[in-house]
Amino acid sequence: IVGAGPAGLACADVLTRNGIEAHVYDKYEEIGGLLTFGIPPFKLEKNIVKQRREILEGMGVKFILNTEIGKDIAFDKFMQDYDAVFLGMGTYKYMKGGFKGEELNGVYDALPYLNSNIRNIFETPNNEYINMRGKNVIVLGGGDTSMDCNRTALRQGAKKVYCAYRRNEENMPGSKREVKNSKEEGVEFLWNMQPIEIVGDDKVEGVKFVKTKLEKSDIRGREVPTIVKGSERIIKADNVIIAFGFRPNPADWFNKYNIQLDEIGRVQIDKDSKYSFQTYNPKIFCGGDMVRGSDLVVTAVFEGRGAAEGITKFLHDNSIRDLDAANL
């Protein structure tokens, strides 16, 4: 299993219960993926993940951490050493806005920012702590990760936190509860505001926005924002956090092993296969965010469990074929 996030852990759980030895690899030093290194501690106590590790290890699951597949271990070796492989590496590639100023000092991507805060709480050595104490902060984006950044900055002691989103509140992709929590804690929302530039010479000085108005709906039912001419406005800020979401980051070795992708890099499952979550390489299974894009933890867990059931059936059928061949 590649990836010790929700999908990988769920897969390991079900495989072990079916008598299959599960080895879980992850590039981080602790299991959990975004459960550990993305979701803030005020939303998920980290000792819950540690307890889950103890339970899984007690069941027989083996964790190989601080190990990146394709870097520390070649995927070729994986294919030689294991009877089946599950990919649950999630989506960690940050989406950018594509506007001027994103590389200025004081601009941070959401996940490294959240990660640094969690590692500071863990007292991780050599952690580059990103602290918003006393700062005016603008968070760009309207999903749950944006809300995590808002609330984390406030807990660090930020002077002011703005959250800017190019649509209105009704069209936000994030949880209504998360927005409500952010409001109650003091976040000021800037609705119908689209960033077009992060301004400053070397360091962030503010964000230039244009107002938007909503028109016809897109294929997902959300109204499409269009720019209001002459509505440019600069809001001053000491720091900017970009939280536009994540997308898959396909590995270099995918093509070699016939791991097929859709137009945005998500792994495609063989829908005609009788084994759930099997890719177009019969030995490789995949689930979670790698298949459907950034989604809920419960969805990743569901797909990890489903993939384990597919792997169990695949290995069972292969064992029967091997026995039949041996008896010929």
Residue ranges of predicted features:
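Conserved Rossmann-like nucleotide-cofactor binding loop
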Residues: 7, 29-30, 92, 145, ...
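Feature captures the FAD/FMN-dependent oxidoreductase FAD-binding
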Residues: 2, 7, 50-99, 197-204, ...
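FAD-site-proximal beta/loop scaffold in flavoenzymes
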Residues: 105-134, 217-294
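Glycine-rich dinucleotide-binding loop and its adjacent helix/turn
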Residues: 54-71, 94-156, 263-275
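Long hydrophobic segments that form regular secondary structure
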Residues: 131-167, 233-239, 245-247, 265, ...
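A conserved FAD-binding loop/helix module that cradles the flavin
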Residues: 149, 290-315
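N-terminal Rossmann-like FAD-binding beta1-loop-alpha1 element of flavoenzymes
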Residues: 1-24, 145-154
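Rossmann-like dinucleotide-binding cores of NAD(P)H-dependent redox enzymes
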Residues: 24, 28-59, 150-197, 319-328
